């Protein structure tokens, strides 16, 4: 009460005795964020939420970007389980990793991407840092470009591209441009359009390329097309920014999936590269990735590494430990690595097999459309060519969920539901 009598009344105490003051204080406290608008829902998560609410026993979720086994269940690779057991038996500590991550993981990641006999590795003219999966690698790379790529702020993305590419580069301060990639008429690669657009990109700009299993289309250039693209990139003196989220998971052969990256480097094109172990090791929730910059020489690589660490420090200080240990154990233990490569091929082959079965079942349904693009495309995702109104019918009439652009995750297709999917697609396209 002394405070009240003194005339020096604290606001909170005064509000307790005067309801009007309390209301005013409450209004002031709640007024900071009244201008913040509700953000749009994530299109992929929206598909999943609608799927969960559906009670149809035949419902299918073809929107999820994660591998499923032939029973439609999440799959933990046996090689991952073995690696976890080996790590647990060592009773290791939980100390912080260095800013750049687990050294043995970074070295093995670079070898996996560039090849064990790569000249880049032998000369030491590269730097690899551990990142928070592929998304983190992209953001680190984009932030480095924003700070040090003095030639241009423009980054050219394929049309279409993974939805997260746009906000990652935009939020890092880069200017977004595009180049033709997908041809809706053929549901394939618009090679002529892509080369024409790339050849007109201003010199010393950044060009984003999907190394393999293009997301969302599943459409990849053939090796001879990659060669022509590399020739144009070199002629225009463009900086090639590779996103490789599916090495091994696309074709079942890690070397084949990394061919484009290695070819560009062999042609004297210095690139940067983002890797993810979410798909090819099934380490989705562990957030395991890497960012590699190929440099002019070892001295330049050391300077780039120092600046990458300066970028990482205020973002998240250092990367997670557990997933990197798992990936490193698999990559650096010969028997585990051999087992893992076999398991990756099994996953890739299952997806390839589902594509073939889907086309076969569409023919059995009597469909007269050309569905060859389904088997021509590669990787987890398939651009079906379905129109938005056809997708809407699939959702409403058959409880088959996918994004409005007709993209499906082939990983969600199994031998037990592929016939139902083919029947439904035929019904909405005949």
UniProtKB/Swiss-Prot annotation:
It is found in: Mitochondrion matrix; Cell membrane. In eukaryotes there are cytoplasmic, mitochondrial and chloroplastic isozymes. It catalyses: L-aspartate + 2-oxoglutarate = oxaloacetate + L-glutamate; L-kynurenine + 2-oxoglutarate = kynurenate + L-glutamate + H2O. One of its GO terms (cellular component) is mitochondrial matrix. Changing residue 262 to G: In DEE82; decreased glutamate oxaloacetate transferase activity. Optimum pH is 8.5. InterPro entries: Aminotransferase_I/II_large, Asp_trans, NHTrfase_class1_PyrdxlP-BS, PyrdxlP-dep_Trfase, PyrdxlP-dep_Trfase_major, PyrdxlP-dep_Trfase_small. The modification Phosphothreonine is found at residues 48, 333. Catalyzes the irreversible transamination of the L-tryptophan metabolite L-kynurenine to form kynurenic acid (KA). As a member of the malate-aspartate shuttle, it has a key role in the intracellular NAD(H) redox balance. Is important for metabolite exchange between mitochondria and cytosol, and for amino acid metabolism. Facilitates cellular uptake of long-chain free fatty acids. Its cofactor is pyridoxal 5'-phosphate. The keyword Transmembrane helix does not apply. The modification N6-succinyllysine is found at residues 73, 90, 107, 122, 159, 185, 227, 296, 309, 338, 363, 396, 404. It is linked to Developmental and epileptic encephalopathy 82: A form of epileptic encephalopathy, a heterogeneous group of severe early-onset epilepsies characterized by refractory seizures, neurodevelopmental impairment, and poor prognosis. Development is normal prior to seizure onset, after which cognitive and motor delays become apparent. DEE82 is an autosomal recessive metabolic encephalopathy characterized by epilepsy from the first year of life, global developmental delay, hypotonia and feeding difficulties apparent soon after birth, and intellectual and motor disabilities. Substrate binds at residues 65, 162, 215, 407. Changing residue 366 to V: In DEE82; uncertain significance; decreased glutamate oxaloacetate transferase activity. The gene is GOT2. The modification 3'-nitrotyrosine is found at residue 96. Its EC number is 2.6.1.1, 2.6.1.7. The modification N6-(pyridoxal phosphate)lysine is found at residue 279. GO terms for molecular function: kynurenine-oxoglutarate transaminase activity; L-aspartate:2-oxoglutarate aminotransferase activity; pyridoxal phosphate binding; RNA binding. Induction: Up-regulated by long-time exposure to alcohol. The modification Phosphotyrosine is found at residue 96. This is Aspartate aminotransferase, mitochondrial. Residues 1-29 form a transit peptide. It holds the Pfam family Aminotran_1_2. CDD domains: AAT_like.
């Amino acid at each position: 009460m002394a405070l009240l009598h003194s005339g020096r009344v604290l606001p909170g105490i005064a509000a307790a005795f005067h309801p009007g003051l309390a209301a005013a204080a409450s209004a002031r406290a709640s007024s900071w964020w009244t201008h913040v608008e509700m953000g749009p829902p994530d299109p992929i998560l929206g598909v999943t939420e609608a799927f969960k609410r559906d009670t149809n026993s035949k419902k299918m979720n073809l929107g999820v970007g994660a591998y499923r086994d032939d029973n439609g269940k999440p799959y933990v690779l046996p090689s991952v389980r073995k690696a976890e057991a080996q790590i647990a038996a060592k009773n290791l500590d939980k100390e912080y990793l260095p800013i750049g991550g687990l050294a043995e993981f970074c070295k093995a990641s670079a070898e996996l991407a560039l090849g064990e006999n790569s000249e880049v590795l032998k000369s030491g003219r590269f730097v690899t840092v551990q990142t928070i999966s592929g998304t983190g690698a992209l953001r680190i790379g984009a932030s480095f470009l924003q700070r040090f790529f003095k030639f241009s702020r423009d980054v050219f993305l394929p049309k279409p591209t993974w939805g997260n590419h746009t906000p990652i580069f935009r939020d890092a301060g880069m200017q977004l441009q595009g180049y033709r990639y997908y041809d809706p008429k053929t549901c394939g690669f618009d090679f002529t359009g892509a080369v024409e657009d790339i050849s007109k990109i201003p010199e010393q700009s950044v060009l984003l390329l999907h190394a393999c299993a293009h997301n969302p289309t599943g459409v990849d250039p053939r090796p001879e097309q990659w060669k022509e693209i590399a020739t144009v990139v070199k002629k225009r003196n463009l900086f090639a920014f590779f996103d490789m989220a599916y090495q091994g998971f696309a074709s079942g052969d890690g070397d084949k999936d990394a061919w484009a990256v290695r070819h560009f480097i062999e042609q004297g094109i210095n690139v940067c590269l983002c890797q993810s172990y979410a798909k090819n090791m099934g380490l989705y929730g562990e957030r395991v990735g890497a960012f590699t910059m190929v440099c002019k020489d070892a001295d330049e690589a050391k300077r780039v590494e120092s600046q990458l660490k300066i970028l990482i420090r205020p973002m998240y200080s250092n990367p997670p430990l557990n997933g990197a240990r798992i990936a490193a154990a698999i990559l650096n233990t010969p028997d585990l690595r051999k087992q893992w490569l076999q398991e990756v091929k099994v996953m890739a082959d299952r997806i390839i097999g589902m594509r073939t079965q889907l086309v076969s079942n569409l023919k059995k349904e009597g469909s007269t459309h050309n569905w060859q693009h389904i088997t021509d495309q590669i990787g987890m995702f398939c651009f079906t060519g379905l129109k938005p109104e056809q997708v809407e019918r699939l959702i409403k009439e058959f409880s088959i969920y996918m994004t409005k652009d007709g993209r499906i995750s082939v990983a969600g297709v199994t031998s037990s539901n592929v016939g139902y999917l083919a029947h439904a697609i035929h019904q909405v396209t005949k």
